[in-house]
Amino acid sequence: MKKLLCIIMSAVMLLSLSCTAFAAGEVKGDISEYPVVIVPGYSSSNLYYGDSLETGETVWGLNFDYVIERVLARIAELGIGLGTFAFDDAEYITDVLASEMNPLFEKLRCNPDGTSVYELHQDYTDALHKNNAYLIENRTDTMYRQEVEISEEIAQYIGHENIYNFSSDFRMGAESCAGELDAFIQSVKEHSGKDKVNIFSLSHGGQVTATYLALYGYKGDVDNAVMTVPAIGGAGIAYDALMACVEFDEECLLRFVENGTMTEENYNWFVKAQPLGFVDTLLNTLFPKIFPTIGYWGSLWDFITVDKYEHAKETLLDSEESAGLIEISDRYHYEILPSIPEKLAECIDNGMNISIIAGTGNVVVTGMQENSDGIITTAAATGATCAPFGQRFADGYEQINPCNGKDKVSPAMDVDASTAYLPDNTWFVDGLFHGMTYKDNYTRTLMFNLLLTDNITDVYSDPAYPQFKYSTNASHTVHASFKGCDEGFVTGGADTLVVMNTSANSTVRIAAIDCDVLDLDFALNPFIDIAPGESIEIPFKGEIPAVSGTVANVTVYYAMDTVTPVGYRTQGFRIDNGESAEKQDGFVSIEPTTPFDGVVDNNLNVILKTFGFREMFSMIFNIIYYWFNALRIF
């Protein structure tokens, strides 16, 4: 019964989330004359089986009316399955689901060697039929257009006639898809009459683009290439799924949803009170039953990160039956992937602008405890070295590569960008979720400037776009910075905290501010309304420690007129005010120490965590504690 209640609760929460509108990103400078090729995320293709598109069977590009029809046809069995599932029996419902999914995706099945069982075709592969202007004129839907929100904004600058939509047989490995991209770019050049293109890519498209640049970049067909949240080194979610070891992080999942819908209510702490572990059981029971249908897709194997690849092969593949698949994926993992830093650097040396935008600060939603954007680990997306999730490098940490004296350690000291594929051309955004680049004012504006102009050539080109940034998505509500300091840093001369309201619709009031490491007294007025997009300056008194290379956490508690009226956000700030802290080895916790931590004993802490109320109690206590100290009479 508890699991059934969880299902109902999660559905209600998801349905209650609302979308938020936002202003367009601002592109400054001369607009590029080259057409844009959009290389989308995973499975963004339409495949058919048969002699022609008109008479063939569509096997990807789902008809959701048909899906609903099948659900209704088996509604009784699904109802029984949910009933048994509520009592910890996932076999029945997953048998029902697998018996529908395997036939539905049968035509997509690959042999154990990675070749397609059926001869499938793409709808169109030429530039004319993939051109936005053509599609808008000849189709009433957006099925064949990729990343529609993004392309609509790009069209404001270059017109739909200069936007082209790439697609591939996404089941195949990155090397195969990169070959298709090369052929498509030749078609775009011929159709547009231009000698180069600009590339915008996302997720799997980022892996394909990086592979294309490694294998075909020598041709010089690209001017700007922007890879957002790219799966260059793989996707953590693929390993968790194929190995049936999903352990959903419910809080991260709900924050992902909040981020995507840009909701201004903070629902995720409710999920802490009622974990949704039933999803883990469902998926881990289902995946082995559908593995014969999707488990031999080369793209899924290229998604396995190199540190887990051999274990996955040994567990799931027969070395003889899957020899062909293994050969192709081995080549990606052990030849192409290691060459990408050198090949991308060569592209830059030859005049191309290559850039990566990646998210940090979240676990993988399916359970992998690594720093990520919720889907792809930061290390896989960028090549950076990351501390274990929930920890940071110890005080006095020294970056691995010197990078000509450039500082490559993140403000929270959990990311070392000196080992990145492109140390000077990669932007890291703490709190950015996968696929949400367009839904963050900072990343949206950055990606359009990188794509459509030649103004930004590296992370030092424009101080408005620092290499490390905290997300400004509306769901975060507030964003803090120290006046006169670089993003994420605090120096000795600082005397003012600037807090911005990142929400789009809600007025915010600052209820309290807590700092660990820094002993600061803020002149805070809790009755000042901060309008959406506006900021206030909060003076403070206190000394910044005369040290560098350590982190102070600043937690801003806020109040707003929403269903969840109180919330908070914690940001880590690197202190840069003197000699480096004495070097220590290993890692330390990244979690802030708050007043509540100092008064709650271990037994009470366990009880509150068990019932999911610790965060709520902590917020209320810390706000009261702040004002008790601020108003105390000596």
Regions found by a protein language model. Name each.
Residues 499-504:
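Asparagine-centered strand-capping/turn motif at beta-strand->loop junctions
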Residues 493-497:
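Structural beta-strand segments of beta-rich domains
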